[in-house]
């Protein structure tokens, strides 16, 4: 499941002028969807137009459809390069026991597989010469998703905000994400 963050009235970050995070992520999501399709990996997009999808609904849709992997796409400041996030739960072992998972720790059972996806994507991005930071954060909706889940956030190159729209740069990012997914998909038991 590819989730282009924000949308509709939620513009996300404003990079000046008409360059908005919601538009950057939607374009990137469409490119990733095509790249995965070209690799023979079926994927779905959580939104394919400029509509608002509330945060909790994003997790609900992903969980209901039992997506193989969830990838949230973001663009933001400050910094440069690419950041790859996985969930950071307060106590994943405690959250993973019992019959029912609390909503805020639904990711517990998939956390190791999420880390494997994050590591594979990070490795592919670095192979393309990109500056990458891999981080664990207690963020939504990652904590609420029951399948392997990562977030990938682009930051501009230096002060060049327009680099967020660079076709060449984004093609490299998309190819790296797709290759990372292709590498671990079978190992983590992911479905489309």
What do these predicted regions represent?
Residues 1-18:
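Short glycine-rich His-centered loop
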Residues 23-192:
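Active-site-proximal helix/loop segments of hydrolytic enzymes
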């Amino acid at each position: 499941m590819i989730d282009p963050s924000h949308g509709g009235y939620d513009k996300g970050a404003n990079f000046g002028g008409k360059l908005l995070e919601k538009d950057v992520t939607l374009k990137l999501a469409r490119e990733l969807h095509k790249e995965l399709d070209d690799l023979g990996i079926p994927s779905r997009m959580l939104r394919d137009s400029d509509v608002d999808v509330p945060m909790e609904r994003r997790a609900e849709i992903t969980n209901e459809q039992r997506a193989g992997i969830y990838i949230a796409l973001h663009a933001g400041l400050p910094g440069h390069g690419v950041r790859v996030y996985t969930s950071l739960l307060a106590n994943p072992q405690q959250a993973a026991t019992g019959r029912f998972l609390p909503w805020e720790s639904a990711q517990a059972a998939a956390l190791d597989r999420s880390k494997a996806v994050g590591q594979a994507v990070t490795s592919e991005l670095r192979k393309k010469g990109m500056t990458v930071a891999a981080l664990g954060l207690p963020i939504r909706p990652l904590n609420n998703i029951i399948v392997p889940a990562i977030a990938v956030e682009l930051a501009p190159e230096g002060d060049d905000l327009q680099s967020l729209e660079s076709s060449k740069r984004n093609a490299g990012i998309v190819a790296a994400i797709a290759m990372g997914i292709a590498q671990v998909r079978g190992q983590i038991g992911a479905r489309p």
